[in-house]
Amino acid sequence: MVGGGGVGGGLLENANPLIYQRSGERPVTAGEEDEQVPDSIDAREIFDLIRSINDPEHPLTLEELNVVEQVRVQVSDPESTVAVAFTPTIPHCSMATLIGLSIKVKLLRSLPQRFKMDVHITPGTHASEHAVNKQLADKERVAAALENTHLLEVVNQCLSARS
């Protein structure tokens, strides 16, 4: 581990992560611009919401670290469900819960209340995936976490635009 830090500061667990190419911006279609046409929420729209979330450890986005990918986002607008699988950069990443919480908060703040959200670790990619997934699925634990001023501040830093 080396010194440095992103949002949390301190020592880095993954001092040299792989950095991936960002996908291009999605072109806006005429149908999407027409306010008279109902515009359903799709996987790309959800990915666009979460791709720029900052990693808590590195000055990079979750997309640049390949923690989130559009192929791991599933949406059913008619059923009002969104599922996002994310992949921590290392199997013992201690930031996995914070990353999942940041994704969940971004979706909670961005989507209509009718949506049921499932944010979870991509199966087989983290040593504690079941424990982390259980925490992220527990509405009371998520609500309690967001009442913690320090934790909410860290989540907000992950969600803020980098300068």
From Swiss-Prot:
SUPFAM superfamilies (UniProt xref): Fe-S cluster assembly (FSCA) domain-like
Pfam families: FeS_assembly_P
Main localisation: nucleus
Subcellular location: Nucleus; Cytoplasm, Cytoskeleton, Spindle; Midbody
Record flagged with keyword Amino-acid biosynthesis: no
Keyword Ion transport applies: no
Swiss-Prot/TrEMBL keywords: Chromosome partition, Cytoplasm, Cytoskeleton, Nucleus
Gene3D superfamilies per the UniProt record, alphabetical: 6.10.250.1280, Fe-S cluster assembly (FSCA) (3.30.300.130)
Xref: InterPro entries: FSCA_dom_sf (IPR034904), MIP18 (IPR039796), MIP18-like (IPR002744)
Gene Ontology CC terms: cytoplasm; cytosol; cytosolic [4Fe-4S] assembly targeting complex; midbody; MMXD complex; nucleoplasm; nucleus; spindle
GO biological process: chromosome segregation; protein maturation
Membership in a protein family: Belongs to the MIP18 family.
Known function: Component of the cytosolic iron-sulfur protein assembly (CIA) complex, a multiprotein complex that mediates the incorporation of iron-sulfur cluster into extramitochondrial Fe/S proteins. As a CIA complex component and in collaboration with CIAO1 and MMS19, binds to and facilitates the assembly of most cytosolic-nuclear Fe/S proteins. As part of the mitotic spindle-associated MMXD complex it plays a role in chromosome segregation, probably by facilitating iron-sulfur cluster assembly into ERCC2/XPD.
Assembly and oligomerization: Component of the CIA complex. Component of the MMXD complex, which includes CIAO1, ERCC2, CIAO2B, MMS19 and SLC25A5. Interacts with CIAO1, ERCC2 and MMS19; the interactions are direct. Interacts with KIF4A; the interaction facilitates the transfer of Fe-S clusters to KIF4A to ensure proper localization of KIF4A to the mitotic machinery. Interacts with CCDC117; the interaction is direct.
Name assigned to this protein: Cytosolic iron-sulfur assembly component 2B
Organism, scientific name: Homo sapiens
